[in-house]
Amino acid sequence: MENITIETEFIKLDALLKFAALTATGGEAKQVMADGMVAVNGETCTMRGRKIRPGDEVTFAGHTLHVQSAQ
């Protein structure tokens, strides 16, 4: 599991995948979500604009990201 620290209230799912270098572009992030390859808190998520908040866990391609607040 990898911890990702954000300084804002939330980060959009597609931006998180790019920030964590799990996808190279927003288009790639959109495609892997549309294909049902991303899970948020254990549930498949296809909404690229989903707001990911501290405490959420995102899983993709064998990686699990735990989002935490910088504060």
Regions found by a protein language model. Name each.
Residues 1-8:
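A detector for short, charged/polar N-terminal pre-domain segments
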Residues 11-54:
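A basic, amphipathic helix-loop patch mediating RNA/tRNA/ribosome contacts
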Residues 2, 36, 63-65:
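Generic structural motif recognizing short loop/turn segments at the entrances and edges of beta-strands
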Residues 44-71:
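C-terminal structural segments of small proteins and small subunits
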